Amino acid sequence: MDGVIESPSNNTIKISPSTSDSSTTTPIITTPPTQSTATVTTKAAATTTTTEASTTPPPPQPTPTPTQSTATVTKEVETTTETIPPIVTKGKIKKSKKSIKKPTIVKRPTTPIDYKQWHTEWPIHVYSHPINGRYLVATKDLDEQTVILRDLPYTWAVDHATCDSVCQHCFLEVPLNQQILPTDFYMCEGCQRVGYCSANCRCIDYSQHRFECQIFKELDTEEYSPFLMSEIKLLVRTLSRKWLEDSITQTAGIDINDETIKKQNTYNQYKNPQSLIPQDNGLRYNDYAELVSNVENYNESLKESLSYWICKYVVKLSAKLGKIEDEFDLLNILLRNRCNAFYIQGRPRDGSSGESRGCGVYVRNSFFNHSCDPNVNYWVVNNTLEVECTLLKNVKEGDELTISYIDTTSPLNKRREKLLEGYLFNCLCTKCVADESLPLDQTGTLEKDDDDNDDEKEKMDEDDDEKDDDINNKNDKKSKYKSDGSTDDEEDEDNNNNKNNNKNKNNNSNNQDHQNNDKSN
């Protein structure tokens, strides 16, 4: 790879030189270029200024023939020297072409992305297994805390519960003081389902939100839970991204898989790549569609589930926009998001880890397989959408790189239950295999669920309450008059009389027995 184009927040384009050594990594966030690697505009301006200020006439040059290559050079110079007022003549074009060595601009990857080129940027490589699918391995020995990957999501959505405090475009969380007294947060006036931290973010995201706004407007948030509403928003957000790519392709009149797209990309497109697709990371819908959805592992009852009816409802709403979609295709998208989405945590407060701001589907991060003893951890960079993956331990060349999908502190049966329910596989990692040899009470098999413990505790409390009620009732009876008007003293006297009567009855019965015995004798 000859170079990587960066688009920092100040809207300046920096071209970082790449190294010829494939073993060295080139991070996405690069340092500003040195003096020898300047921008194209700076070089063109410096050359033009030198040519005009020079008093010595240039050496005679052969008159260039008006070929196609000359016209191409003229177009490139005019495009890359937008800040130079004078018009460059043909003679100067020839001199500029000879003196300026334009850096080669690496085109953004088109579909399908070549994941085999990752070793030129990051020390990882993608392999495929017939059963386990694609997975990542280290291409060399790496130390702990080494950054092995940074990634942006293909699709993302803000949680419905935080849509009034998290920007839909950049995922910036509004400070707490502005959440109480909002001043600079812009909610969409059409649907009131998404908001933005600035007018610039709202303007950039409009190219995609214009598709989903009409659908969000039709959704009744009171009919769905916040979790389900967030899932619907991610589904619609993925659809709108797909429609945006289709509209760009139709407007350009070219096939997105056509090789000619590489020739028609201009420098201005890389100068502001967000003008076409928000948060463009070079991925397209075909790359997203290759992710696993596990739809084949679901039974026929899925067609009667709520997810299927949600997809049918979204299909009807899409038809109002002139977009023809199939229920089964939308079901694939919904299940694909469930299997591959990463929750994006918010800013920690009061010692907590922070609530979820939303979720996103990171295509490259989805290649990490699960392990209950992972060697890679990931987190969000500076309250944005970018995710950084670092090593938790030293790894050797060829070792598989894994992350954890669940809480690994849970016992064995709880971990496997979570993975089977959410990801439809039974974990056989080294930690799970080792835990199988533990006693049953340590694997969690004999442990009672929290709900069972709560029920048992409530039952014990009820028994204690009943005992207390019995004691209180007895005390109340002693302190109150009886229904016949007798007091406690009279009650005691009656009890004594009853005891005496019982004794007399017993004596009479004994005397009767003696008489019977005498008769028999």
Curated annotation (Swiss-Prot):
Pfam families: SET (PF00856), zf-MYND (PF01753)
Transmembrane segments: none
InterPro entries: H3K4_H4K5_MeTrfase, SET_dom, SET_dom_sf, Znf_MYND
Biased composition regions of type Pro residues, renumbered to the chain: 56-65
PROSITE patterns: SET, ZF_MYND_1, ZF_MYND_2
GO CC terms of this entry: nucleus
Positions of region (Disordered): 1-101, 442-521
UniProt feature, compositional bias: Low complexity: 12-55, 66-90, 497-514
Source taxon at top rank: Eukaryota
Acidic residues composition bias: residue spans: 448-469, 486-495
Keyword list, A-Z: Metal-binding, Methyltransferase, S-adenosyl-L-methionine, Transferase, Zinc, Zinc-finger
Domain SET span(s) in chain numbering: 122-406
Biased composition (Basic and acidic residues): 470-485
Mapped zinc finger ranges (MYND-type): 167-213
Binding site for Zn(2+) 1: 167, 170, 197, 201
Molecular-function GO terms, alphabetical: methyltransferase activity; zinc ion binding
UniProt KW Iron-sulfur keyword: no
Binding residues for Zn(2+) 2: 188, 191, 209, 213
Keyword Zinc-finger part of the UniProt annotation: yes
PANTHER family tied to this protein: HISTONE-LYSINE N-METHYLTRANSFERASE SMYD (PTHR12197), SET AND MYND DOMAIN-CONTAINING PROTEIN DDB_G0292140-RELATED (PTHR12197:SF211)
Purpose: Probable methyltransferase.
Similarity remark: Belongs to the class V-like SAM-binding methyltransferase superfamily.
Record protein name field: SET and MYND domain-containing protein DDB_G0292140
Species of the source: Dictyostelium discoideum (Social amoeba)
Lineage, uppermost ranks: Eukaryota, Amoebozoa, Evosea, Eumycetozoa, Dictyostelia
